[in-house]
Design a protein with these regions (language model features):
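A well-structured
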Residues: 1-313, 598-603
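Short pre-active-site segment immediately N-terminal to the catalytic Zn-binding motif
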Residues: 315-320, 368-390
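Catalytic zinc-binding patch centered on the HExxH motif and its immediate surroundings
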Residues: 316-318, 351-371
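Conserved helix-loop functional segments at active or binding sites
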Residues: 329-340, 363-366, 395, 399-407, ...
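Long, K/E/R/D-enriched contiguous segments that form extended
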Residues: 295-333, 339, 350, 373-374, ...
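C-terminal, non-catalytic "cap/extension" segments appended to globular domains
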Residues: 6, 11-12, 21, 25, ...
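Post-HEXXH active-site segment of zinc metalloproteases
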Residues: 388, 399-423
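Short beta-alpha connecting loops at secondary-structure transitions
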Residues: 374-378, 405-415, 444-453, 472-474, ...
Length: 603
């Protein structure tokens, strides 16, 4: 849709917009609560230095903090949702800016709590629990803070580290400025001979071109820019890795990875098991890349050939009007109680469907504890947006069940778990479409969508996770992370993952230079574990495993009342073992087998 044909926000039919009145009736009501929230936040500073006044007083402090957090979260949710629906609205811009300012004031006002709690001797805190039974309600919340006692420094050292925060973040800030503001990519000759400005946005689209010359030029010209700045980019990334290792060392962790995984109480064995299990099954990815090479009729498959469509235009489309029925049918294995939540999403206007001028791009699930779990879309009538819809509804159902079954303090859930709920829905949709359609072209398209999903999320994100850990280990051992060292080792790793059918040349060796996730401190592995767990659950739910379904719903209701690994064990999945990853790769193999067979039949 061109900019000229885009509706304004005022032109959007109300039925296709989300209903934000579950937050505030209007901006005046928002302002009235904002005034109250400012006073609540200001009052929190009076509790500083008082956590040694007994268990009952500690309960009072926690409740005051939670009450302020709830109100500020509500104010922020309304402001940012209003801004995201139309960023050109000046009133929304003001609301959003003021909400962020209030969030900063809240963070400053409660900054005393964790250090002060950690300064209490363990015996004192346990005495608080004994003398104040109502404090036991907050045991998990407090345990999650106090388990970091061994990694907490003195007050003066903590203050010093906090003051260094901006400096510690400077490698990523520098990379981001270079990558998003300073780099100037060339213009290339696009499809049909027209000039196309190469950008991060056009790069992905141009790699999908059916014209191999366009794909080659796009790839080579894109990496030419990174090659020009390879020394600087290596230095910036190296500094980021050194920062991770330094912070882990001063906090008495055995490694940067141990420090990063400590946040969610995830054993390091989960990470190692992912790398080992995926590494043992790379032959499946090699089969898939070899098949792509054959289908494209190429003597040599280059990295720029991995994204062009294998099957042409989609043989089926899905309209917004059809979406509800498809969602209800595809997610029927989740049971009537889950479908009631899906019905609420459509009937109660959780979803903001269509693009308009000023609306945020992409899709997400948002909201807060006592609001609707909203879904932002920019819907188009295609299969990708159908998958996006069920994905975001998976997040919203997770939020709805956590919020309705947990108190505010335990209602959130970790990133480690978040993608499981959303991707389980995607996998159920895949299963539904494969059961519904017997047309070979439709089945091929759905199978290809799934296979590409595993390639991009399980294999590719595991490759990133392996290289991220390799860099941290190399730096810890004193190896300089020069551009030569990074490029050659990344090229070798790429060859290991994609196999002999793909030419892993020096250009793809430079991919390390453009991956933002390498600055996120052991974040990226969670995409692969989450997708694998989701495939494990969806396979069993689709097969009618009622006991596992109930356990899975228990996970959706649990929020952060347990640590993520314990939540998954209770749901029937031990993520310290390799079984769930192997199960996912078996599904990949079975669908690859069918994909190959259907291709042979339709030749």
């Amino acid at each position: 849709m061109s900019e000229e044909t885009l509706r304004t926000r005022e032109q959007q039919p109300e039925a296709f917009t989300w209903d934000l009145t579950s937050l505030y009736a209007d901006a005046d009501q928002w302002q009235a609560e904002y005034d109250k929230a400012e006073a609540m936040v200001a009052d929190l500073t009076s509790y500083k230095g008082t956590l040694d006044q007994g268990g009952a007083h500690l309960v009072t402090v926690i409740e005051a903090i939670q009450a302020a957090c709830l109100v500020v979260e509500r104010l922020y949710a309304y402001a940012h949702l209003t801004y995201d629906q139309d960023s050109t609205n000046s009133a929304a811009q003001v609301l959003n800016a003021r909400a962020m300012q209030l969030y900063s004031k809240l963070a400053e006002a409660i900054a005393f709590f964790d250090p002060e709690l950690l300064s209490l001797p363990s015996e004192t805190l346990e005495a608080y629990f004994q003398e104040t039974p109502e404090l036991d309600f907050y045991r998990q919340y407090l345990d999650d803070i106090t388990r970091g006692r061994a990694h907490t420094l003195s007050a003066s050292e903590e203050t010093l580290l906090a003051q260094l925060g901006e400096i510690f973040n400077s490698p990523y800030s520098t990379f981001s400025l270079l990558d998003n503001a300073d780099f100037v990519f060339p213009t290339i000759e696009g499809p049909g001979g027209q000039a196309v400005q190469l950008t991060h946005g056009t790069y992905g689209r141009l790699l999908e071109s059916t014209d191999r010359r366009v794909r080659r030029d796009t790839f080579q010209q894109y990496y030419t820019v990174y090659n020009q700045f390879k020394n600087t980019l290596a230095n910036v990334l190296s500094t980021n890795i050194k920062t991770d290792n330094y912070k882990a060392k001063v906090r008495h962790y055995s490694s940067a990875r141990a420090a990063a995984l400590f946040r969610n109480n995830v054993p390091e064995s989960v990470y190692d098991t992912l790398l080992e299990t995926v590494g043992d099954h790379l032959g499946l990815l090699h089969r898939y890349t070899a098949l792509r090479k054959d289908l494209l009729g190429l003597d040599s498959l280059e990295m720029y050939d991995l994204y062009t469509p294998l099957l042409g235009d989609a043989p089926i489309k899905f309209s917004q009007a059809e979406a509800r029925d498809i969602v209800m049918e595809a997610l029927a294995p989740m049971g009537p109680d889950y479908l009631e939540i899906m019905a609420k999403a459509f009937d109660e206007r959780w979803i903001d469907w269509y693009e308009n001028k000023g609306k945020r791009s992409g899709a997400y699930s948002g909201g807060m504890y006592d609001s609707k779990p909203y879904v932002l879309l920019n819907w188009q009538d295609n299969i990708n947006w159908l998958f996006t819809l069920v994905h975001e509804l998976g997040h919203s159902a997770h939020s709805y069940l956590s919020r309705t079954n947990q108190p505010y303090v335990y209602s959130d859930y970790s990133i480690f778990l978040a993608e499981i709920a959303s991707t389980t829905n995607e996998n159920l949709l895949t299963d539904y479409l494969l059961k519904k359609y017997q047309d070979p072209q439709i089945r091929l398209y759905v199978l290809n969508h799934f296979l590409d999903g595993v390639k991009g999320t399980v294999f590719r994100q595991t490759q990133f996770a392996e290289f991220e850990h390799f860099m941290h280990q190399a730096d810890a051992e004193g190896t300089p992370l020069t551009h030569e060292f990074l490029t050659e080792n990344y090229r070798k790793l790429n060859a290991k993952y994609y196999g002999p059918s793909v030419n892993s040349d020096s250009e793809i060796g430079l991919e390390w230079a453009r991956i933002p996730h390498f600055y996120y401190n052991y974040y990226v592995f969670q995409y692969a574990t989450g997708f694998s767990a989701a495939t494990f659950f969806a396979d069993k739910i689709a097969a009618g495993d009622s006991a596992l379904l109930e356990a899975y719903k228990g996970f959706l209701k649990s929020g952060c009342s347990l640590y993520p690994i314990d939540t998954m064990k209770k749901a029937g999945l031990d993520m310290t073992q390799r079984d769930y990853i192997e199960a996912t790769l078996k599904v990949f193999e079975a669908r690859l087998n069918e994909f190959e067979a259907l291709l042979a039949e339709t030749k």
